[in-house]
């Protein structure tokens, strides 16, 4: 029998770093996450992502794979090699929003 445990987690305690070079993707994710009461930081490239990961210490990084200059795999590799950021979970994404 499972004990009855009521655990309430406030999403506002968690910060998500959204990294994507496509503005519509960033806006969609920001709206979805803020509606769920997460704190959201957005950046548009890998260099900014590396800087914000160190400075803001997000709880999660949503990272686009297909970005110019430094792709998501390169960013993830650098984050995992850095002792200051290696603990942060990363979700790599291939989001393409079609607007008609």
Q: Where does each model-flagged region fall?
A:
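His-Asp phosphorelay/catalytic-motif detector in bacterial-type signaling
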Residues: 13, 57-59, 84-89
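Acidic catalytic/metal-coordinating carboxylates
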Residues: 24, 44-48, 71-77
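Non-catalytic signal-transmission and effector/linker regions of two-component phosphorelay proteins
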Residues: 1-17, 30
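Two-component/phosphorelay signaling modules centered on CheY-like receiver
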Residues: 23-41, 47, 55
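Short amphipathic alpha-helix used as the core "switch/output" element in two-component signaling
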Residues: 51, 73-86
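Active-site residues of response regulator receiver
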Residues: 20, 64
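Conserved small/polar residues in nucleotide/adenosyl-binding loops
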Residues: 95-100
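Receiver (REC) domain active-site loop signature in two-component systems and cognate sites
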Residues: 67
């Amino acid at each position: 029998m499972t004990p009855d445990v009521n655990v309430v987690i406030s999403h506002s305690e968690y910060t998500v770093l959204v990294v994507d070079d496509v503005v519509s993707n960033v806006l969609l994710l920001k709206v979805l996450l803020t509606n769920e009461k997460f704190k959201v930081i957005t950046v548009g490239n890998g260099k900014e992502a590396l800087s914000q990961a160190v400075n803001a210490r997000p709880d999660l990084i949503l990272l686009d794979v297909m970005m110019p200059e430094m792709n998501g795999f390169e960013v993830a590799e650098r984050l995992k090699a850095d002792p200051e950021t290696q603990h942060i979970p990363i979700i790599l994404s291939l989001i393409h929003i079609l607007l008609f």
